[in-house]
Every structure is written in structure tokens, then in C-alpha cells.
Amino acid sequence: MQQTYDTVRQLLEAGKTAEAERLVLQELEVVPNDATLLYLQGRIGAKRADWQGALNAFNRAVQLDPDSPAREARQAIEEILAFYHKDYYNP
């Protein structure tokens, strides 16, 4: 599975978001409760400015692994939304 994580990270760094998303979704079909895959799914959502999708993925990742880097990523998105969309976002 580590190879999959590394491949997804490389695809994201190369700007190949669609390919990264396909791979993550394919793997989530097999292992739906993988916190790292969910974290990566959240990163893909954030890269696309799909804030709700990113938050959903990060929340699921944190539920599965409270020490996941998704916790910090989720907090960063919440801060972005609170700053730019005060009228839409009220935590």
C-alpha cells in the first residue's frame, strides 16, 4: 500500500490530479477505511478547491486515525473558509 501512497503523492506533485484521484478512488473501493487514502483524497479535493469534499475526506481520516495529518489539513481549510467566506462558513 505504501507504493500506492507514494504514487498518489508523486502524481499530485506533478499536477496530475485526475490520475491521482482515479487511483485513490480505485483503492478506496478495496480498502474504504484507509486513513491515509482518505487524507490523500482530501488533498486532492483541496487542490481542486473542493473545500467540502476535502473536509469530508479529512474528517473521515481523523475519525479513523486521530493522529492523521488530516487533522492539520482540516484545520487549515477551516481557517481559509473562515477568512474568505465568513458569511458562508460559521464553525
Placement of each model-derived feature along the sequence:
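Terminal, low-structured helical/coil segments at or just beyond the last alpha-helical repeat
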Residues: Q3, R71-P91
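Short coil turns that delineate tetratricopeptide repeat
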Residues: P32, D65-P66
